[in-house]
């Protein structure tokens, strides 16, 4: 598509996997003008509803848009989902400068401290720890995670934290409020899961 600008990594081995996302916070990354609204999304999201409310979200200046990963029992270690970050270009440059000073240290730190599960992880912990802007929390009911191995835990957290009346997922359908579904975790590949709803929304 002519409106899509693909930016190749100059050195894919410079950082470990998802830690490359920290580059997005470098001021004017990809030629994006200072002050332009940015949204970082991981590639393992599936859009299941109307996301206009997300794309048009009125994020105040000098704030960081995120949501609480309600499905996790480790929120005391890291509250945000690193696969969704909303900000204005230039406001988060400090994340990049802090990381760039000691990338080897930070890429191992949260795993060594028992705050993230290896072999590669911790970038969302880094952002959660080092973001200096006020946070704006988008509604939790817009977002969900799908992981068959954690279904009952996710369902329980949904009822306890988000919606006591409706299930988050039943008979191949998500709750009407859910707009995006994340397949986080290294062993949770959406292309390997054979469910009709994935075909309906993704392929």
PLM features: residue spans?
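Short glycine-/acidic-enriched loop or helix-start segments at secondary-structure transitions
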Residues: 2-4, 49-52, 190-193
């Amino acid at each position: 598509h002519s409106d899509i600008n693909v930016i190749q990594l100059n050195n894919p081995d410079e950082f470990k996997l998802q830690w490359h996302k920290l580059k997005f916070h470098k001021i004017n990354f990809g030629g994006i003008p200072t002050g332009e609204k940015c949204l970082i999304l991981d590639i393992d999201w599936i859009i299941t509803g109307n996301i206009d409310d997300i794309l048009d979200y009125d994020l105040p200046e000098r704030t960081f848009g995120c949501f609480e990963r309600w499905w996790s029992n480790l929120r005391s270690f890291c509250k945000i989902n690193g696969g969704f970050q909303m900000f204005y270009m230039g406001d988060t440059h400090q994340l990049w400068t802090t990381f760039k000073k000691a990338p080897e240290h930070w890429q191992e730190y949260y795993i060594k401290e028992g705050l993230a599960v290896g072999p590669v992880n911790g970038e969302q912990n880094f952002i959660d720890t080092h973001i200096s802007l006020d946070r704006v929390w988008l509604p939790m009911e817009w977002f969900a995670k799908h992981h068959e191995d954690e279904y009952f835990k996710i369902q329980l957290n949904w009822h306890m934290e988000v919606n006591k009346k409706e299930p988050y997922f039943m008979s191949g359908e998500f709750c009407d409020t859910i707009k995006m579904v994340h397949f986080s975790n290294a062993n949770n590949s959406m292309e390997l899961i054979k469910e009709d709803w994935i075909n309906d929304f993704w392929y």
